[in-house]
Amino acid sequence: MKIRASVRKICEKCRLIRRRGRIIVICFNPRHKQRQG
């Protein structure tokens, strides 16, 4: 999980989701997991 100021999709499989007011990216590739900090 990477904590970033700006999150974006890295590949086509990445999904942007809003959870508890935070934007997170989930993907089948674990390296693409991100969260806005």
UniProtKB/Swiss-Prot annotation:
GO biological process: translation
Subcellular location: Plastid, Chloroplast
One annotated GO molecular function: structural constituent of ribosome
Keywords: Chloroplast, Plastid, Ribonucleoprotein, Ribosomal protein
PROSITE patterns documented for this protein: RIBOSOMAL_L36
Domain of life of the native organism: Eukaryota
Cysteine disulfide partners in this protein: none
Keyword Ribonucleoprotein: yes
Entry's family note: Belongs to the bacterial ribosomal protein bL36 family.
Official protein name in the record: Large ribosomal subunit protein bL36c
Organism: Gossypium hirsutum (Upland cotton)
Gene, per the UniProt record: rpl36
